[in-house]
């Protein structure tokens, strides 16, 4: 693959000019990755079609399941049917973006180490983590992005509640925070391939993590105020230790104008920032222990 030409900036280049030039270079590089991914998929249209049909079936089955559940009850833990579908669409948007851009690359990280292709990435005039994280994409997941967006719009229209432009901007920001959080977890986990050689548990890790994020935080509330229940233990762990519940619940509550305590949003932002910085440190530290294809 030929990389776009990168105009290297000198020490005398103004700061904002340097940032702009670097950003434009990486945007061009990302657009080339997307174009290459589409070309690869069109070489095997049957495989692409099967993936799309599978996503459509999974989406339809999940929506039908919760329509059936909500036909028997009006609310589940203060979430009405359309409010829950808004939450579901938010979770799908986050998952589909992560799986489209980052999952194929993180899953292939150990293969790059085994075959020596990681050496190639490290010798390119590009940030190694950017190249390792985004060089292969899964275009079939873009179908799920569209489905999730359609479900979100339909659910919000059914609720018929006014949404301010500020809420939309904040919602999109929180989506970006959530994607960053899950990416940070994923790339840090993938880095273990440098020591283990193979890391086949990445898909299992992602599957179990996203199971907990499929339901709003309030679902894990206890039923007995007099004792600390197992659901509340999970709620605490996945809210304050590893905020998996917050990164999906808070964006949904924001667009629904039912946001909870500001401490939840602060915890999500702080945890995501810490996770991203830590994942960057783990990646660079792992590369320091990488000995090349011959090892």
What are these regions (language model features)?
Residues 1-22:
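N-terminal amphipathic/basic-hydrophobic helices that include classical n-h-c signal peptides
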Residues 19-295:
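Hydrophobic transmembrane alpha-helices and immediately adjacent juxtamembrane helices
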């Amino acid at each position: 693959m030929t990389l776009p030409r990168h105009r290297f900036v000198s020490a005398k280049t103004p700061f904002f000019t340097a940032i702009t030039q670097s950003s434009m270079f990486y945007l061009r590089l990302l657009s080339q990755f997307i174009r290459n991914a589409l070309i690869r998929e069109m070489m095997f249209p049957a495989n692409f079609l099967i993936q799309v049909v599978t996503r459509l079936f999974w989406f339809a089955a999940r929506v039908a399941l919760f329509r059936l559940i909500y036909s028997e009850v009006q609310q589940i833990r203060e979430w009405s049917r359309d409010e829950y579908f808004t939450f579901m669409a938010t979770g799908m948007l986050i998952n589909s973006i992560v799986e489209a851009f980052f999952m194929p690359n993180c899953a292939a990280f150990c293969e790059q180490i085994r075959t020596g292709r990681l050496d190639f990435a490290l010798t390119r005039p590009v940030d190694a983590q950017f190249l390792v994280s985004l060089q292969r994409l899964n275009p079939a997941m873009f179908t799920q992005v569209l489905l999730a967006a359609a479900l979100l719009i339909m659910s919000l229209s059914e609720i018929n509640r006014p949404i301010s432009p500020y809420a939309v901007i904040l919602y999109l920001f929180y989506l970006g925070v959530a994607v960053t959080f899950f990416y940070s977890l994923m790339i840090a986990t993938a880095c273990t391939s440098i020591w283990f050689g193979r890391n086949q548990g990445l898909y299992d890790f992602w599957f179990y993590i996203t199971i907990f994020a499929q339901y709003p935080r309030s679902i894990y509330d206890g039923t007995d105020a007099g004792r600390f229940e197992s659901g509340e233990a999970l709620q605490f762990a996945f809210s304050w230790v590893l905020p998996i519940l917050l990164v999906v619940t808070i964006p949904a509550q924001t667009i629904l104008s039912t946001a909870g305590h500001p401490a939840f949003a602060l915890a999500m932002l702080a945890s995501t920032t810490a996770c991203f910085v830590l994942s960057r440190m783990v990646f660079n530290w792992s590369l320091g222990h990488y000995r090349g294809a011959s090892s």
